[in-house]
Amino acid sequence: MKFFIDTANLEQIQEAYDLGVLDGVTTNPSLMAKEGIKGTENQREHYIKICKIVNADVSAEVIATDYEGMIREGEELAALNPHIVVKVPCIADGIKAIKYFTEKGIRTNCTLVFSVGQALLAAKAGATYVSPFVGRLDDICEDGVGLVGDIVRMYRTYDYKTQVLAASIRNTKHIIECVEVGADVATCPLSAIKGLLNHPLTDSGLKKFLEDYKKVNG
C-alpha cells in the first residue's frame, strides 16, 4: 500500500517525508484555507513547494465545477510540475474532464466518491486515482471501508487500472481496515500515520531491554 499525507502543511509533509514512508500528498481547498493560503497564485506556488519536498504525486484540486473551467484550471495545474495530479469532483462535467485529461496524458484523481457507480464512471473515464471518502460515509452511518472493498473488487473483476485511494481516513483503524480490503493508497493525516507505530508491547519491550542492558553494563 502507498501512503499519502492529506494536508497542505509543509512542516507535516516534511515530517512524513523524513519518516521514509511517504508516497505522495493530497490537498483540497479546505486544507489550503486551513493553512491561510489565499489567492490562485499563492496556492500554485504552494503546490510547487510541496512537489519539491516529496518528489512524488501531489493531488491539486480544481475549483471550477463546469467543464470548460475544469479543463482550464487542470491544464494550468498540470503545467506547474510533472508530479501534479489534477483532482476533479465526481460530477458529470468532472467525468467529462477526466476523459479529456486522460486523452491528453494528464493524470487525475476523481474525488468526492461515495458509491460504486461513481467509481465505475471514474474508471471508465480513465482516472488515475479514485477517492472514496471513508470517514464521511461513517459519519452518516454508512460503511466507508466496505465501499473501498467493493470498488477494489469491481476494478479487479473488470481489470480497470484506476488505483483506489482511500480518503477521509480519520485514524489508524481506518488505515488497517483499508489495507485488509486491498486499497492501493491511503491518504491520511500525519497523526494516523504516526499512530501505526504505537503499541504498548513495543514500549514495554523496549523499556525491558534497556533495563536489562543497564543491569549488565552498569
From Swiss-Prot:
Principal location class: cytoplasm
Reaction(s) the record says it catalyses: D-sedoheptulose 7-phosphate + D-glyceraldehyde 3-phosphate = D-erythrose 4-phosphate + beta-D-fructose 6-phosphate
GO biological process entries: carbohydrate metabolic process; pentose-phosphate shunt
Record EC number: 2.2.1.2
Pfam family, one: TAL_FSA
Active site: K87
Primary enzyme class: transferase
Cellular compartment(s): Cytoplasm
Pathway(s) the chain acts in: Carbohydrate degradation; pentose phosphate pathway; D-glyceraldehyde 3-phosphate and beta-D-fructose 6-phosphate from D-ribose 5-phosphate and D-xylulose 5-phosphate (non-oxidative stage): step 2/3
GO CC aspect terms: cytoplasm
Keyword set, alphabetical order: Cytoplasm, Pentose shunt, Schiff base, Transferase
Cytoplasm recorded as keyword: yes
GO molecular function: aldehyde-lyase activity; transaldolase activity
The organism's place on the tree of life at top rank: Bacteria
Family classification: Belongs to the transaldolase family. Type 3B subfamily.
PANTHER family registered for this protein in UniProt: FRUCTOSE-6-PHOSPHATE ALDOLASE 1-RELATED, TRANSALDOLASE
The protein's role, per its UniProt record: Transaldolase is important for the balance of metabolites in the pentose-phosphate pathway.
Listed name of the protein: Probable transaldolase
